[in-house]
């Protein structure tokens, strides 16, 4: 047990302790609950009522959530469909990724507020009597016996609690506490030349995710439910501090110049640094995804750029891939690193592929300089008309198309879906 001279009191034993109530953690929790496992979720935030940026669901993620019985309920809470994405340079369309050409019913990019998705997942988890949810609870230690992870330590002193589990799943994001406590090395890889400054504006809806190149730094823009547009203004990697030192008026003017279509709205609605948030963009990967009794999934195991809207989809796919491995491990009472490595063996190649595609997209769409400006229009026209581009578009949209929700592992007589 790490970090606690006076061990807290033991809590109940559970089959799986999931740390992190994001898309990866809650999807896995529901999958395991539907398969008859006891699941304890530990989430440091007290509620889902907080700001989220990533909310674009690709068709592959939509299909998996639908198979789990979650998509319809989350959509009913409010969402916005986009027909595809477009790269626009000074009013001219260079690339048009038309998702309507993909087979239905998931032939769109779905802007679904993460709060809506997580709320629906959490409600369905709470319908299961084997589910325990510890919100507002921080993990600050692992229970270890002979090098095997046996649970987590939450809090400390008189208010502390030990959650013992057959397997601990770290799904607590890019700065994962579980990963650090487990001593798993993480390689941060500086593959991208841009960071992203996000802001949300009230503006009319559009049907396309767009990348604007209008003379300033490129801007990502998409409609967000109910009546907002999310703007992601790109700026040189690690360059925000120097920019911010020139004052908010300067930052706002740079954003206005980069996206003339929203210039007046930016002027009216962005008033201070509180209205923007910086995303440090980098790639990263844990060197191991597992230890005896412990598994990492989602951003805890691999980190991606926001370009291409892959993060949520990869997280959901990780959960779907981990589900049958954990079910079999619990049945065999084998949750060793060797056994759990089956998850990384399946998912790591896919996540590395996603990173390579994101690097390609970043260089094509976001790079600056005279050479890039001269080459981009011709290169975009040539690339977008090749069969290889259509293949890449399908890979972006679906990811690993062999992944399926293993509903054959679900128990009969489950709680009714809502």
UniProtKB/Swiss-Prot annotation:
Involved in the biosynthesis of the tetracycline antibiotic, oxytetracycline. It holds the Pfam family FAD_binding_3. This is 6-methylpretetramide 4-monooxygenase. Keywords: Antibiotic biosynthesis, FAD, Flavoprotein, Monooxygenase, NADP, Oxidoreductase. Its cofactor is FAD. It catalyses: 6-methylpretetramide + NADPH + O2 + 2 H(+) = 4-hydroxy-6-methylpretetramide + NADP(+) + H2O. GO terms for biological process: antibiotic biosynthetic process. Pathway: Antibiotic biosynthesis; oxytetracycline biosynthesis. Its EC number is 1.14.13.232. Disruption phenotype: Cells lacking this gene produce oxytetracycline with a yield of only 50% compared to the wild-type. It comes from Streptomyces rimosus. GO terms for molecular function: FAD binding; monooxygenase activity. Belongs to the PheA/TfdB FAD monooxygenase family. FAD binds at residues 15-44, 289-299.
